[in-house]
Amino acid sequence: MAGRSGDSDDQLLLAVRLIKILYQSNPYPKPNGSRQARRNRRRRWRARQNQIDSISERIPSSCLGRPAEPVPLQLPPIERLRLDCSEDCGNSGTQGVGDPQISGEPCMVLGAGTKE
């Protein structure tokens, strides 16, 4: 966790440990008993799991003082994204990384799509 102070690393590890303990404290119910008993156990398990989910969402903001989710990444409109057929697709290098290929004409990758 480069670039951060050790104190926030300790707080992050503490938050992760707390969330892990919460989820481990609610194991999935055993598959024994009548159908109704199994259904009731699963229903109660789901209710506890929902409570754990809501608590674990609040832990990072209270322990670390920041929201749990990162800032959303702004993506270009999907209409402007396409696969570039002119590039060598077999190359595993860094060609085209970070440079979206935008063109006015569509690329024929799959063909016309008509059945014969």
Curated annotation (Swiss-Prot):
GO terms for cellular component: host cell cytoplasm; host cell nucleolus. Gene3D superfamilies: 6.10.140.630. GO terms for biological process: mRNA transport; viral process. Keywords: AIDS, Host cytoplasm, Host nucleus, Host-virus interaction, Methylation, mRNA transport, Phosphoprotein, RNA-binding, Transport. A motif (Nuclear localization signal and RNA-binding (RRE)) lies at residues 34-50. InterPro entries: REV_protein. The keyword RNA-binding applies. A motif (Nuclear export signal and binding to XPO1) lies at residues 73-84. One of its GO terms (molecular function) is DNA-binding transcription factor activity. Residues 36-47 have a biased composition (Basic residues). Escorts unspliced or incompletely spliced viral pre-mRNAs (late transcripts) out of the nucleus of infected cells. These pre-mRNAs carry a recognition sequence called Rev responsive element (RRE) located in the env gene, that is not present in fully spliced viral mRNAs (early transcripts). This function is essential since most viral proteins are translated from unspliced or partially spliced pre-mRNAs which cannot exit the nucleus by the pathway used by fully processed cellular mRNAs. Rev itself is translated from a fully spliced mRNA that readily exits the nucleus. The RNA-binding motif binds to the RRE, a 240 bp stem-and-loop structure present in incompletely spliced viral pre-mRNAs. This region also contains the NLS which mediates nuclear localization via KPNB1 binding and, when the N-terminal sequence is present, nucleolar targeting. These overlapping functions prevent Rev bound to RRE from undesirable return to the nucleus. When Rev binds the RRE, the NLS becomes masked while the NES remains accessible. The leucine-rich NES mediates binding to human XPO1. HIV-1 lineages are divided in three main groups, M (for Major), O (for Outlier), and N (for New, or Non-M, Non-O). The vast majority of strains found worldwide belong to the group M. Group O seems to be endemic to and largely confined to Cameroon and neighboring countries in West Central Africa, where these viruses represent a small minority of HIV-1 strains. The group N is represented by a limited number of isolates from Cameroonian persons. The group M is further subdivided in 9 clades or subtypes (A to D, F to H, J and K). HAMAP family: REV_HIV1 (MF_04077). This is Protein Rev.
